[in-house]
Regions:
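Glycine-rich phosphate-binding loops of nucleotide-dependent enzymes
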Residues: 2-202
Length: 202
């Protein structure tokens, strides 16, 4: 596996920053079967952290448990976001507390243009990056702002999903399989953009 040296350097620097997302003794299950058992973690401000594992290892379940989005839910342990107890929240409360999630299926809304997808994300506070700033971050989206979101390429849909998350005022951004099925040139473009986002203070 190739690792971008900038990611390693930035992650090492971030270890000295305060933890913004933490979990202790985290368990989650489907039915009677545990999918996630005894996970502990700290994610620091300015850190890019990756979950690595085979298919079925529980990566998506871990992210969904942190974000409180459906089953499985955490049944034991604690998750804290900037001193706020995520383990006591519903998904909409976690989002309002500053947790952003880009799911693997991206969930681009049919019938809405790129711009309308972003506007919908800002229909209620807390509002994050302005739409024009997001177009500066993702020029491809600015060029296609009037195009229906679901007609974009896979890579452009992923950019839209990330931009939509940033349209909210978030402290942590979780990405589930962000590069799955994308061309290497798009992966490189998104990776560089994520590093730029981190350098802007996330």
């Amino acid at each position: 596996m190739n690792v971008n040296p900038d990611v390693v350097k930035n992650a090492n620097q971030a270890k000295w920053a305060p933890a913004v997302l933490s979990g202790w003794g985290m368990h989650a299950y489907y039915g009677e079967s545990y999918i996630v058992q005894g996970i502990n973690f700290n994610v620091h401000e300015g850190e890019i952290l990756a979950l690595l594992g085979r298919n079925g290892a529980g990566k998506t379940s871990t992210l969904r448990s942190i974000a409180r989005t459906g089953s499985p839910m955490v049944t034991q342990g604690e998750i804290w976001l900037d001193h706020q107890p995520l383990h006591k929240m519903e998904s909409h409360e976690a989002a309002a507390a500053g947790l952003g999630l880009v799911p693997e299926d991206r969930r681009i809304i049919p019938g809405l243009t790129v711009e309308e997808n972003l506007q919908l994300a800002q229909i209620a506070p807390p509002i994050g990056w302005s739409i024009e700033r997001l177009y500066d971050l993702f020029p491809r989206l600015g060029e296609r702002r009037k195009q229906e979101g679901v007609t974009l390429s896979g890579g452009e849909q992923q950019m839209l999903a990330i931009a939509r998350a940033l349209a909210r005022d978030i402290k942590v951004l979780l990405l589930d399989e962000p590069y799955e099925g994308l061309a290497p040139v798009i992966v490189d473009e998104i990776e560089k953009t994520l590093i730029h986002i981190k350098e802007q203070g996330m």
